[in-house]
Amino acid sequence: MVVESNCEIPENLYYFIEGKNTVWAKLESPDTIVVGITDLAQTMAGKIVKVRIKKKGTKVEKGRPVATMESGKWAGPVPAPVTGEVVEVNAEAEKSPIIINQDPYGKGWLVKMKMSNPEELKQLFSGQAAIQKLKELIASEKLTCKRL
């Protein structure tokens, strides 16, 4: 785990980084990933008060919303890191969105997706490239991460 300005960056994840949108993906099986938002994203959003996650069985294109979130200062989409189908939804995150702020890489996961094309994972940031890209975003936004 790399920590930059109090922001946790797990090294074993894949990252979809587009502008200020930062989403992580963890390979659970050869064709299934777990998806959530990063520590940076939850810090920039502030206290998340509502999350709407696409229903199980929904097909989502890469970059299109797999969920939407609202906080006191922000509302917006959570992009799918790859194209695929929602196979499981974190009902606990929908019921108590604060867990996304408290544990974005653990209990605060959003969906599990069956990938249409597992090769798309190679297009995401990972390893040192991901760490460098996220560190640059932390610096440009002058962020210090905090958990609620």
Curated annotation (Swiss-Prot):
Modified residues (N6-lipoyllysine): 73
GO CC aspect terms: glycine cleavage complex
Keywords: Lipoyl
CC cofactor: (R)-lipoate
InterPro entries registered for this protein in UniProt: 2-oxoA_DH_lipoyl-BS, Biotin_lipoyl, GCV_H, GCV_H/Fam206, Single_hybrid_motif
A biological process term (GO) from this entry: glycine decarboxylation via glycine cleavage system
Domain Lipoyl-binding per the UniProt entry, residue ranges: 32-114
Co-factor binding comment: Binds 1 lipoyl cofactor covalently.
A Pfam family recorded for this sequence: GCV_H
Complexes and interactors: The glycine cleavage system is composed of four proteins: P, T, L and H.
NCBIfam families: PRK01202.1
Family the UniProt entry places it in: Belongs to the GcvH family.
Known role: The glycine cleavage system catalyzes the degradation of glycine. The H protein shuttles the methylamine group of glycine from the P protein to the T protein.
Protein's name according to its UniProt entry: Probable glycine cleavage system H protein 2
Organism of origin: Saccharolobus solfataricus (strain ATCC 35092 / DSM 1617 / JCM 11322 / P2) (Sulfolobus solfataricus)
